[in-house]
From Swiss-Prot:
Subunit-level organization: Homotetramer.
Record's function text: Catalyzes the formation of dTDP-glucose, from dTTP and glucose 1-phosphate, as well as its pyrophosphorolysis.
Keyword match Transferase: yes
Source taxon at top rank: Bacteria
GO BP terms, alphabetized: dTDP-rhamnose biosynthetic process; O antigen biosynthetic process
Annotated positions binding Mg(2+): 111, 226
Keyword set includes Cell membrane: no
Alphabetized UniProt keyword annotations: Lipopolysaccharide biosynthesis, Magnesium, Metal-binding, Nucleotidyltransferase, Transferase
Protein name, as recorded: Glucose-1-phosphate thymidylyltransferase 1
Amino acid sequence: MKTRKGIILAGGSGTRLYPVTMAVSKQLLPIYDKPMIYYPLSTLMLAGIRDILIISTPQDTPRFQQLLGDGSQWGLNLQYKVQPSPDGLAQAFIIGEEFIGGDDCALVLGDNIFYGHDLPKLMDTAVNRESGATVFAYHVNDPERYGVVEFDDNGTAISLEEKPQEPKSNYAVTGLYFYDNDVVEMAKNLKPSARGELEITDINRIYMDQGRLSVAMMGRGYAWLDTGTHQSLIEASNFIATIEERQGLKVSCPEEIAHRKGFIDAEQVKVLAEPLKKNAYGQYLLKMIKGY
């Protein structure tokens, strides 16, 4: 099986969240008990991806490095690259060309939170595809606010539209994408859109026109949370808090995922829990490894 590398795009200026984000990256803001970046990082970890590139702004990259380090504490290999200006999501593949090398890749947006019991299974199908691309569609009430995908009974995309006035479906394309290695050359050959950006929708459209774009449906029982407004930040935190308090289980806890995936052993979890043992997060980790 081919290696698949991951990219987290955590750039942007977060102007919609000013003044909150005037001095700190949006992706470092708390979503209940964790920094926002933990959630997309956990999504890639659940897909079994351990080589991950974090792309951010020149001013925020050192802060991500301070928080996450080289990833070895979780059995990961984290690298960092700067996106000098936000010139579109597809630019991630140009910035990450050297990191991706000859491998397939996955891209997740740093402000997208995914939740669902079968999410790892859904991603496994995308990971194991030999070629082509997979996007993840989520049913929304207001599709005109998103990139909208229409697909046939086999899950093959037949149309893609960006914020259409008359949507052909209620399925929005989420901020999680799996691509074969062809994506790098596609991104390098893209022309900027009318708003001057290299659009991810244009990449997806190329795959669709080639008949190589699969759509994985996030149906009932999944949550996709976008955190672009003050209100949605509160809603995301409340959602995570409700689940964690009700079940007594953490959502998107990198230490737990790394341990369950066999990236690290119980002894390493203990080391990571030690500085946190006075709070609920650290106590959760210590409780988790009891019996190991």
